[in-house]
Design a protein with these regions (language model features):
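Adenosine-nucleotide cofactor-binding segment
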Residues: 1-58
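Glycine-rich phosphate-binding loop and adjacent beta-alpha segment
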Residues: 2, 11, 58-129, 162-164
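Short, hinge-like loop/turn segments at secondary-structure boundaries
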Residues: 15-21, 37-38, 90-94, 115-119, ...
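Short conserved AdoMet
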Residues: 44, 68, 154-155
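Short catalytic-loop micro-motif centered on adjacent basic/acidic residues
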Residues: 49-52, 72-75, 132-135
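C-terminal capping/lid region of NAD(P)-dependent oxidoreductase domains
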Residues: 122-123, 127-136, 144-164
C-alpha cells in the first residue's frame, strides 16, 4: 500500500499489479478491518506470500492479517513512528513467519552474501532490468531540505544529495 494516488500511479508504472491507497491509515478497529479486507481483496491467492513493511504502527496488524498461508512478514522499519504489537496467534493461524530485516547488521555479519547481492543489483542496473526512481536531486549543502521533504512524505522514489 501507498499513501497517495500519485504514488499508486508510479507503482503501477513500475509494474505493480494493483495498489492499495491507505491515506492516513487505519486509526480504529473498524478502519483497520476495512484496510485488511481491501488488502486481501487485491490478492489473487487469498493472501500474500511476502509482506514488506517499512511502516509499522497501525498498518502492521491489518497488513499481517492479509498474509497468506506460510507467508513471510518482513519487518523493515517503523516509519510511522510506533513499534507495532502483533497478536502472535496470527502466526499460528496462518503458518506464517515474521522476519526482521536489518540491513546494517547484515552487511557486517554476512559480508560475502552482501557483496554478492550488491553485484547482482549492479548487474540488474547495468542491464536496464531495474531503474531507480529519483524524485529529486538536492545539493549537499541543502541536506536539511531533503530531510524535510522526506519527513513531509512528499517524495515519490528517492532523494539524492549531490556534490557540486
Amino acid at each position: 500500500g501507498v499513501s497517495t494516488e500519485e504514488k499508486a500511479k508510479v507503482c503501477k508504472e513500475y509494474g505493480a499489479d494493483d495498489v492499495v491507497v491507505y491515506g492516513n491509515g487505519p486509526t480504529d478497529k473498524d478502519s483497520a478491518k476495512l484496510f485488511s479486507s481491501e488488502l486481501k481483496s487485491k490478492s489473487t491467492k487469498g493472501g500474500y506470500d511476502i509482506i514488506y513493511d517499512p511502516i509499522g504502527d497501525c498498518y502492521a496488524e491489518p497488513a499481517f492479517r492479509s498474509i497468506g498461508w506460510k507467508g513471510k512478514y518482513l519487518v523493515i522499519g517503523f516509519a510511522a513512528g510506533q513499534i507495532p504489537k502483533l497478536p502472535i496467534n496470527l502466526t499460528l493461524l496462518k503458518g506464517a513467519s515474521i522476519v526482521g530485516v536489518f540491513w546494517g547488521a547484515f552487511t557486517g555479519r554476512e559480508f560475502e552474501e552482501n557483496k554478492k547481492n550488491i553485484a547482482d543489483i549492479n548487474s540488474l542496473l547495468s542491464n536496464g532490468d531495474i531503474k531507480p526512481l529519483i524524485s529529486k536531486k538536492i545539493p549537499m549543502e541543502d541536506a536539511i531540505e531533503a530531510i524535510n521533504l522526506i519527513g513531509s512524505r512528499g517524495v515519490v522514489g528517492k532523494v539524492v544529495l549531490v556534490n557540486k
